[in-house]
Amino acid sequence: MEEFDKSISFDGRDIRLKIGLLAPQAGGSVLIQSGETAVLVTATTAKAREGVDFLPLTVDYEERLYAAGRIPGGFLRREGRPPEKAILTGRLIDRPLRPLFPNWMRDDIQVVATTLSMDEEVPPDVLAVTGASVAVLLAGIPFQGPMAAVRVGLLGDEFIINPTYKEIHNGELDLVVAGSPEGVVMIEAGANQLPERDIIEAIDFGYEAVRDLITAQRELIDQLGIPLVTREAPAVNETVQNFLREQAKEEIKQILSQFTLSKTERDEKLEAIENRIKETITALPDEDTLKAPTLEEPKLIGNLFKDLTKKLMRAQIIEDGVRVDGRQLDEVRPISCRVGVLPRRVHGSGLFNRGLTQVLSIATLGTPGDAQDLGDDLHPEDEKRYLHHYNFPPFSVGETRPMRSPGRREIGHGALAERAIVPVLPPQEEFPYVLRVVSEVLSSNGSTSMGSVCGSTLALMDAGVPLKKPVSGAAMGLIKEGEEVRILTDIQGIEDFLGDMDFKVAGTDSGITALQMDMKIPGLSMEVVAKAIEQALPARKHILEKMLATLEKPRTELSPHAPRLLTIKIDPDLIGLVIGPGGKTVKGITEQTGTKIDIDDDGTVTISSTDGEQAEKAKRLIYNMTRKLNEGEVYLGRVTRIIQIGAFVEVLPGKEGMIHISQLAEGRVGKVEDEVAVGDEVLVKVREIDSKGRLNLTRLGIHPDEAAAARKAATVV
């Protein structure tokens, strides 16, 4: 393919698409660039593997440190496993792509996005999303695109398309909107408690920019003469399909309308019907018109049974306005909450139950040194002081499988719940702790990520973290049949599995802090998006009321096992003095007091210990070591050595002065040893600090009040 360039501008910021330059053997490839950030995106497909009954789409996002002119650390000096940011970006690309492929497609598809160059202004993630659409179109893969994504920021009252890192950091909103010609297909957002109307306006603003990028892609493929590829859906075996309807339709409808059934009971009854039909067909001769297709396609009955169940459940919601558990469309499942469910050795814990979904969240308070260092990736963010980790063990859904490290789904759910809480954390200056919350999903029937948001809030409040406001969350669903649309509040597992949307909304009573929307259909109108956001508000408030009935406000006392933090600000030029040669001084303080000490480059010293007295002692030691001495001040010091004309006294750690023999006592002193000995504690006043910083001390003229104050304040090392 010949090289071809196309540009589109947003507020003076260009996005360039370069075709035919790189990766000629990939099915489709594009270099998408904005500023000095450039991402190569490729799409390649392979024939379907036998027995696959799902879309085997793989999206990989790769970052290379050469993109920022850096060499990786470590012995190997090459990139290792993808950081969490790369995994989340891979999910960001996958989520708007997946619903645009035909649901019957089984070909292997691999999309790879590689950041080749990166500046300090333009994030590569939204470029990679748009680039993925272009690459898929160029690869000739059946696709209901084009699709594109933009980021929307909010500075003051002004929305910005594709803000820089600095604008994102300084703004009130970080919103990514992806869309197709049909409408919005994906939303990912973090916000500083913005009201619903502002969020809706931002999504609409972003989708208008998405439409411009879609138009640009259409013009591109027209200019290149590349047709949009369509492929006929494989024919459904009507003989088997009709047999299933005759045998199972009424029974399935009856089960779906038995609202008292538990999830397990409903699943067992549906499985029994499916197994009975399979046994009936298996007993037939191989040449029978019912059995022969199932021999060619072993999963045919299971797939058709799922499709029938899906249609009947959706029809029940559309026609009757009632769900499989008997709830109304806007009704939340029963909620119960508990705090302090674990011993106080754990700093804080919260148990959140919503229907059959149960999440146990545990909060841990750490020191500034426990912050997660993000310095190895390409992004400006240095470290995280709030971490949320989400675990989804197999027993939570009654299954068995190997327990492995967190997968992409767990990382994504953890990041969403983390993003929901960050806007309400207390400022670091007021509460310098590093916070980690782990959410253990103990039972899952939908909306576990929002359960983790609620559990995290309870655990942090139980731990005594002074949150600005508590956060709750709800997952919204959608059933769309033609022009008929039904929005569901607080979806459960079967509604997520068989529905068209999973829209998670988290926030406080003042506004939204996080959004995540994924679709299974090619797009959603802004009208429906707005309605879903608005319908989530009363649900969030209802859930929040239940949470606050359990614990109205954060506890005023920390767990006795949580570290006590004290901070002191020192002159940055004195950091070396506190650390000492080879860390000798700071190690000595930590060994003497049993504390942990963290020192920031700006001179902030944080002392942590479960023993408050020892923390205070360490603070006094550092204060005395770094405080400025003034003439006329009185100190309690220790005699370190004696010479013929006087004695040297350490008044503060590392700071010595000399008392001349004439200043040791009233009247004439014959020998220094007559008045003091090495190791004696003595009260001294600073007579003079000479031009070289040397201290001249005296024991004369010290008022009793000055002496008492010096003894009280002193800590002699």
From Swiss-Prot:
KH domain spans which residues?
A: 563-622
> Does Secreted appear among the keywords?
no
Entry GO MF terms: 3'-5'-RNA exonuclease activity; magnesium ion binding; polyribonucleotide nucleotidyltransferase activity; RNA binding
Localization per Swiss-Prot or TrEMBL: Cytoplasm
Per its record, the protein catalyses: RNA(n+1) + phosphate = RNA(n) + a ribonucleoside 5'-diphosphate
Query: Quick check: keyword Cytoplasm in the entry?
Result: yes
Annotated SMART domains: KH, S1
The enzyme class is transferase
Alphabetic keyword roster? Cytoplasm, Magnesium, Metal-binding, Nucleotidyltransferase, RNA-binding, Transferase
Identify the residues that the record assigns to the S1 motif domain, covering every copy.
Answer: 632-700
Name the cofactor(s).
Answer: Mg(2+)
Function noted in UniProt: Involved in mRNA degradation. Catalyzes the phosphorolysis of single-stranded polyribonucleotides processively in the 3'- to 5'-direction.
Q: What is this protein called?
A: Polyribonucleotide nucleotidyltransferase
Q: Organism source for this protein?
A: Microcystis aeruginosa (strain NIES-843 / IAM M-2473)
Q: Lineage of the native species?
A: Bacteria, Bacillati, Cyanobacteriota, Cyanophyceae, Oscillatoriophycideae
